Swiss-Prot record:
The gene is bpt. Its EC number is 2.3.2.29. It comes from Pseudomonas aeruginosa (strain ATCC 15692 / DSM 22644 / CIP 104116 / JCM 14847 / LMG 12228 / 1C / PRS 101 / PAO1). It is found in: Cytoplasm. The keyword Transferase applies. One of its GO terms (biological process) is proteasomal protein catabolic process. Transmembrane segments: none annotated. Keywords: Acyltransferase, Cytoplasm, Transferase. Its main location: cytoplasm. This is Aspartate/glutamate leucyltransferase. The keyword Oxidoreductase does not apply.
């Protein structure tokens, strides 16, 4: 924490919250002039920071503490019955690690995902510029995990590979393959990959108790939440 105390951070002005419409949000950003090296990012992930594009951020709201960083300690994870079914259903998928890049195959999948799954969100309507700015970043720790079935692209898990674990940045998938539960499968695969790499945890971003879209995160047990400057197991 001593090194982190020397860093500069900037807070945004209050703005409408994307998850709790009745709330005003404030976000704390790492000084964008600070080089985002892998070790610094890992250290900040340990205190609840996330990456979006080229920025590291954390909620910094004055009157709300609903957004809580969440991670899965993979050594203790055991899939439940439903999760085992999802793993079996997708066992034939091939996963390929790629450097982040823009191509029409990726963008078409992203566009259809946003249009059919998140037309009510602040990422709608999708655009090529939005896709490139948000996800296609030339960072040494970032990769695209492609999930393919007989060559056909079904999903991409945008993932940061850090010394302390995998950070699940964003996953988008074929909305016509709903029966496969590809979003859940991507997390299960990231858990297995984290363990294979000998790393500690999968960082899932923020969990909000009263946000329906966030409920899926607590289906992975055990899960730890960053509360009062320390990680505690959710019971």
């Amino acid at each position: 924490m001593t090194e982190l105390a020397r860093l500069k951070f900037y807070a945004t002005q209050p703005h409408p919250c994307s998850y709790l419409p009745e709330e005003q949000a404030t976000t704390l950003f790492l000084d964008p002039s600070q080089p985002m090296d892998t070790q610094l990012y890992a250290s900040l992930s340990e205190v609840g920071f996330r990456r979006s594009g080229d920025h590291l951020y954390r909620p910094h709201c004055q009157h709300c503490t609903a957004c809580i960083a969440a991670r899965i300690p993979v050594a203790d994870f055991s899939p439940n019955r439903q999760q085992r079914r999802i793993l079996k259903r997708n066992a034939e998928l091939q996963v390929i690690r790629k450097r982040p890049s823009f191509n029409e195959e990726y963008y078409d999948l992203y566009r259809r995902y946003i249009e059919q799954r998140h037309a009510d969100g602040d990422m709608y309507p999708p655009s090529r510029d939005q896709f490139a700015t948000f996800l296609v970043r030339d960072l040494p720790f970032c990769c695209f995990f492609e999930f393919r079935l007989h060559g056909r692209l079904l999903a991409i898990a945008v993932t940061d590979v850090l010394p302390n674990g995998l950070s699940a940045v964003y996953t988008f998938y074929d909305p016509d393959e709903e029966q496969r539960s590809l979003g859940r499968y991507a997390i299960l695969w990231q858990i297995a990959e984290t363990e294979r790499l000998g790393l500690q945890a999968v960082y899932l971003g923020y969990w909000i108790k009263n946000c329906r879209k966030m409920n899926y995160k607590t289906q992975y047990r055990p899960i730890e939440l960053f509360v009062n400057q320390r990680w505690v197991a959710l019971t």
